Amino acid sequence: MFMADAYFADTVWYVGQIIFIVAICLLVIIVVVAFLATFKLCIQLCGMCNTLVLSPSIYVFNRGRQFYEFYNDVKPPVLDVDDV
């Protein structure tokens, strides 16, 4: 009877070790997946920042420069007026 209890205790210990190792692996996987999801979200936010902020500002800058060049091309020359 004593030997059966010893084998049962060893079996429970091994099963406990296996459960502990599996739990640690799952915890590590969850942490790694959370880190990768956070990294991916940061990359997406940077892309959205590029789309919403950088691209429109470059567009506005280029259009403003085009209008400025067009205005300088079509404006009449300054007339010399004698001081009165």
Swiss-Prot record:
One of its GO terms (cellular component) is membrane. The keyword Transmembrane helix applies. It comes from the Viruses. It is a single-pass type III membrane protein. Residues 40-80 are intravirion. Residues 1-18 are virion surface. The chain crosses the membrane at residues 19-39. GO terms for biological process: disruption of cellular anatomical structure in another organism; viral budding from Golgi membrane. It is found in: Host Golgi apparatus membrane. Keywords: Apoptosis, Host Golgi apparatus, Host membrane, Membrane, Transmembrane, Transmembrane helix. Belongs to the betacoronaviruses E protein family. Homopentamer. Interacts with membrane protein M in the budding compartment of the host cell, which is located between endoplasmic reticulum and the Golgi complex. Interacts with Nucleoprotein. Plays a central role in virus morphogenesis and assembly. Acts as a viroporin and self-assembles in host membranes forming pentameric protein-lipid pores that allow ion transport. Also plays a role in the induction of apoptosis. This is Envelope small membrane protein. The lineage of its organism: Viruses, Riboviria, Orthornavirae, Pisuviricota, Pisoniviricetes.
